[in-house]
């Protein structure tokens, strides 16, 4: 029998115990702030605390966090998440929460913060683009309004009934943003073989005094592109009213009955573009031309609603263009599926030929493997794994959002480089000043970063935690052990290594020191 609410009830009880200080067995210090918590909860939610307590569980009652990286409000928010499973940013900057989560190796929170920063950057970019489009459209309306008086003299004659049928599928007269006499519509490439379309387009071009795009300049199917009647306010304001054309007098009545449903409005599109001179030789549209947005055409709309309003001679072209479009989409999706797979196979082949996973597997004790959850690399000790994890969250790998104009951005006073938070700025300033704030109490040697000091401390303690499995020699640094193995035991390691499937580690063999020594002397 299962109790679905058991986990929620357990977290609630642990949260109450933390607030009461009951059974709290550790204290986390962030600057001057103190946080009482339970080691089991911290180690379960953070890889940093897991590696911190792994070797010396009983000797580490107090945990000091770097206040330059982790702020007290950000850690309080992450601590609430550990006990309640809810993340509420409130008024905290996302950059501070991202820096704290990266330092504590809380990967789920890092992904959420990066996603929010990316959405924020996308929103700001979209708003900026809309403002630019609105300004460019208003300028185009002013330039196009100067020639609107010539429209009345260029009205098509009664013999252009085929061209009027094509225009009858347009949802509204306001959706056509075209310069007078320069309006052209994209026709299917197969339309060159249809005499009706070509014969009716030429008289209209002669009467208007301009060149209408012939079928050879079309690149998309007319039936595949119907007019989108739902537009942004900026797009609606920048289009021209073509009501001066007498041949379009019946369009409004047709639109009221045809576009009565909002679903049909959103599903149908036709693309109408503006250019000064359209000819068979021109295939590119300049960046200043106004391009109307279009969305994906639904199958149900194209099958049930749009077909009955198309001209009869365009029906076979519509079916052919739909089939060609579906084939192109299938090929594109196949290419997208093939590319990551091929890249992954190359990566797997490189990992199989690498010696590091096998050496790391042999170096660690039987049954203990310290694997990076992000890149699947293996390390001989939790300390080296912790140092490696910090490389995944370097400054250049983070996603940076464009800060608002009224926000004080951390900026270097010497080189003018900007940063997302104060920690990265302080770390960068050390490159200019040469400051080394971390000093060894034994010899007085200084270091720029705390992990370098921790690595140096082993020199004074004379500890040699890294042992060779075959000759019983011990080393202070893991790099010395790797060089020793490559120099003396490389052939033996290759003979013992068994390649497994891609991205999987080789099985650990139980070799005693006596067996390995005999193997060396053979």
Curated annotation (Swiss-Prot):
Record's keyword annotation contains DNA-binding: yes
Cross-link (Glycyl lysine isopeptide (Lys-Gly) (interchain with G-Cter in SUMO2)): 273
Zinc finger regions, C2H2-type: 370-392, 410-432, 438-460, 466-489
GO molecular function ontology, one term from the record: zinc ion binding
Renumbered residue ranges of the record's region Interaction with DNMT3A: 310-427
GO cellular component terms attached to this protein's record: heterochromatin; nucleus
Biological-process GO terms, alphabetical: cerebellum development; cerebral cortex development; hippocampus development; homeostasis of number of cells; in utero embryonic development; negative regulation of DNA-templated transcription; negative regulation of transcription by RNA polymerase II; neuron development
UniProt cross-references to PROSITE patterns, sorted A to Z: BTB (PS50097), ZINC_FINGER_C2H2_1 (PS00028), ZINC_FINGER_C2H2_2 (PS50157)
Coiled coil: none
Record InterPro entries: BTB/POZ_dom, SKP1/BTB/POZ_sf, Znf_C2H2_sf, Znf_C2H2_type
Described function: Transcriptional repressor that plays a role in various developmental processes such as myogenesis and brain development. Specifically binds the consensus DNA sequence 5'-[AC]ACATCTG[GT][AC]-3' which contains the E box core, and acts by recruiting chromatin remodeling multiprotein complexes. Plays a key role in myogenesis by directly repressing the expression of ID2 and ID3, 2 inhibitors of skeletal myogenesis. Also involved in controlling cell division of progenitor cells and regulating the survival of postmitotic cortical neurons.
Subunit structure: Interacts with DNMT3A.
Record's protein name: Zinc finger and BTB domain-containing protein 18
Organism: Rattus norvegicus (Rat)
């Amino acid at each position: 029998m299962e109790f679905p609410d058991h986990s929620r009830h357990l977290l609630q009880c642990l949260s109450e115990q933390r607030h009461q200080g009951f059974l709290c067995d550790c204290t986390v210090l962030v600057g001057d702030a103190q946080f009482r918590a339970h080691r089991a909860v911290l180690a379960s939610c953070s890889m940093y605390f897991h590696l911190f307590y792994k070797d010396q569980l009983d000797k580490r009652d107090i945990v000091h966090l770097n206040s330059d990286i982790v702020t007290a409000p950000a850690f309080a928010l992450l601590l609430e998440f550990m006990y309640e499973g809810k993340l509420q940013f409130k008024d905290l900057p996302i950059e501070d929460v991202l820096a704290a989560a990266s330092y504590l190796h809380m990967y789920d929170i890092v992904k959420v913060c990066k996603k929010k920063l990316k959405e924020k950057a996308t929103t700001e970019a979209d708003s900026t683009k809309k403002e630019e489009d609105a300004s460019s459209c208003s300028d185009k309306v002013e330039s196009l309004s100067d020639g609107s008086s010539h429209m009345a003299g260029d009205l098509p004659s009664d013999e252009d009934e085929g061209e009027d049928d094509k225009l009858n599928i347009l949802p509204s007269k306001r959706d056509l943003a075209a310069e007078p006499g320069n309006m052209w519509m994209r026709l299917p490439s197969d339309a060159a073989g249809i005499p009706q379309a070509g014969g009716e387009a030429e008289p209209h071009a002669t009467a208007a005094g301009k060149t209408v795009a012939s079928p050879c300049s079309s690149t998309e199917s007319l039936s595949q592109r119907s007019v989108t009647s739902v537009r942004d306010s900026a797009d609606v304001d920048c289009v021209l009213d073509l009501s001066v054309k007498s041949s379009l007098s019946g369009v409004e009545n047709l639109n009221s009955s045809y576009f009565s449903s909002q679903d049909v409005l959103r599903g149908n599109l036709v693309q109408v573009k503006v250019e000064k001179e359209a000819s068979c030789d021109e295939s590119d549209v300049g960046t200043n031309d106004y391009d109307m947005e279009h969305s994906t055409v639904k199958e149900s709309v194209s099958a049930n609603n749009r077909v009955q309003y198309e001209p009869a001679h365009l029906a076979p072209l519509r079916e052919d263009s739909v089939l060609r479009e579906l084939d192109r989409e299938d090929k594109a999706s196949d290419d997208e599926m093939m590319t990551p797979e091929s890249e992954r196979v190359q990566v797997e082949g490189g990992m199989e030929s690498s010696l590091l996973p096998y050496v790391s597997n042999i170096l660690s004790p039987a049954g203990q493997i310290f694997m990076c959850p992000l890149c699947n690399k293996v390390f001989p000790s939790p300390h080296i794994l912790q140092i490696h994890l910090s490389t995944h969250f370097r400054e250049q790998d983070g996603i940076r959002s464009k800060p608002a104009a009224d926000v004080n951005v951390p900026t270097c006073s010497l080189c003018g480089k900007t940063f997302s938070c104060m920690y990265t700025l302080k770390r960068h300033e050390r490159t200019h000043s040469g400051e080394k704030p971390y000093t060894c109490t034994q010899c007085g040697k200084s270091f720029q970063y705390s992990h370098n000091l921790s690595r140096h401390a082993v020199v004074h303690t004379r500890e040699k935690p890294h042992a060779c499995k075959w000759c019983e020699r011990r080393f202070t640094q893991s790099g010395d052990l790797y060089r020793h193995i490559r120099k003396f035991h490389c052939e033996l390691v290759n003979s013992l290594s068994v390649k497994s499937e891609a991205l999987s580690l080789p099985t650990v063999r139980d070799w005693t020191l006596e067996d390995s020594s005999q193997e060396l002397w053979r």
